[in-house]
Amino acid sequence: MIRPDRCPWQPCPSGRYLSRPSGRVPRSTMMTPMTAMPAVTAMPPETAAPPETAAPARPLRPVQALLVVDVQTAFVSGAEAVPEAARVLDRTRGLLARARTAGALVVHLQNDGAPGAVDAPHTPGWELHLPVEPGPREHVVRKTEDDGFADTGLGALLDAAGVTELAVCGVLSEMCVAATARTALELGHRVVLPHDAHATYDIPAAPDISDTVPAAMSSRAAEWALGDEVEIVPRAAAVPFVAPPLAPAPEAPAAAAAPAAGTGLSPAGPPPAPAR
């Protein structure tokens, strides 16, 4: 994962570049140049959501899977943590508890950063910050790109369980969260994105371009860039879960649930680091 304060449009330590999202946004909603931008503040735990994400008039339809994106120690604790780490951790814990109780599929995405990065494999910052509950319905998928589907077994895992509807949470909003959600949409999944369960960093000021962009504004822009297909809800607490139609039984032996070698999947935790 590349932090936005490391390289606005400059080569990053990982050798990748920040790029504009590819989500489809109606032309009529595109912004024109402005001399000033409205203030966006972080969302307090129990205050009203932004007008654009007003509470739905009817209960949300349940989802069959939860994708927890890069909730790794470096990004949610210590000096490198996103500003709203405490909120994201609280909401993610709630989502995990309800998903597990309902028998939904849970997938923890874990980013393998470049050597020397805060999330380089097998460093303290790389570790998943929240506990994984081993079993056939809970997996860890390691990745090397922002998109959790890129060169991983995530798509096959969802298909095997019959998942067609899922929720996404984690960090960073405009990078790995958005990239993973966008691909899920392109693959035909229904995607629910709880507004209070993802976060990112402030974007630092750039001479002759902009002042500092608050993290809350970056997160909101990331949601908007996903287009009309994504379902943005104000509260993670409003997301219900249900077991997917083809999910393995909870009592299935671990050996039967183990994936084939080379898929990058593990029901009990991260697999060995891939050869470099």
Swiss-Prot record:
> What temperature behavior is annotated for this protein?
Optimum temperature is 45 degrees Celsius.
Q: Which Gene3D superfamilies does this one have?
A: Isochorismatase-like
CDD domains xrefs: nicotinamidase_related
GO biological process per UniProt: response to antibiotic
Query: Among its keywords, does the record have Transcription?
Result: no
Q: Which residues lie in Low complexity bias regions?
A: 252-267
**The EC number(s) this enzyme carries:** 3.5.2.19
Q: How does activity depend on pH?
A: Optimum pH is 6.5.
Its UniProt entry gives the catalysed reaction(s) as: streptothricin F + H2O = streptothricin F acid
State how the cofactor is bound: Does not require a metal cofactor.
Question: Which residues are catalytic?
Answer: 176 (nucleophile)
Molecular function (GO) terms for this protein are:
hydrolase activity, acting on carbon-nitrogen (but not peptide) bonds, in cyclic amides
Identify the keywords attached in UniProt to this record, alphabetized.
Antibiotic resistance, Hydrolase
**Xref: InterPro entries:** Isochorismatase-like_dom, Isochorismatase-like_hydrls, Isochorismatase-like_sf
Region annotation Disordered: where it falls in the sequence: 250-276
Protein's job: Catalyzes the hydrolysis of the amide bond of streptolidine lactam, thereby conferring streptothricin (ST) resistance. Can hydrolyze streptothricin-F and streptothricin-D. However, this strain is believed to be a ST nonproducer, which raises the possibility that its true role may not be its involvement in self-resistance to STs. May catalyze the hydrolysis of naturally occurring cyclic amide compounds that are structurally related to STs.
- Which family does the record claim for this protein? Belongs to the isochorismatase family.
Binding partners and assembly: Homodimer.
Query: Can you name this protein?
Result: Streptothricin hydrolase
Species of origin: Streptomyces noursei
- The encoding gene is sttH
